[in-house]
Amino acid sequence: MNVVNMVINCRVLESDDVPSYRDIRLESLKLHPEAYGSNYDTERKKSELFFENQIKNQSSENLMIGAFHHSMLVGLCGLITIENDQFSIVQMYVKSAYKGQGIGQALLSKAKSLLLQYQRSGLVLTVYEHNKQALNSYIQAGFQETSRRENEIVMQFVHRP
């Protein structure tokens, strides 16, 4: 979908968003199994996915940000609290038809804006080194490489007030 000036709204998902979250999460696992630590067949059989529970209970430790085009959920960015009062970014995904529209950057921008609200010092993520599009997107968003392990690059964004 190539729409000029597409209006995207990013926000933390709420209970009413759980069915849409499940659909897009399973889609991400089915279409891009190489990008995630979970797999489609295992996850689709679960009665409740990890983040479904977190969303329903409005956890302040683990958040799922959604990107919406009108009322349709088109992107995800999960945040899990880790040591040193940081969020780890997980389950980053944008629907294929919406790639290249700045939605990933909008999700990362929303994640950065939540650092102050949830009193976190930074964001950490891992990206497969072969995923050049994601890697470039993270660099553009201000993330810096901190280390490498196997075929993954560990990156960090530190909030500076």
What annotation goes with each model-predicted range?
Residues 1-5, 57:
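Short, conserved catalytic or adaptor-binding loops enriched in Gly and charged residues
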Residues 7-10:
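Extreme N-terminal starter segment of soluble prokaryotic enzymes
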Residues 15-16, 22-91, 95, 108-109, ...:
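Acetyl-CoA-dependent GNAT
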Residues 94, 100-113, 136-140:
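Conserved acetyl-CoA-binding loop-helix of GNAT-fold acetyltransferases
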Residues 101, 117-121:
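Short coil/turn segments at alpha/beta junctions that flank glycine-rich nucleotide-binding fingerprints
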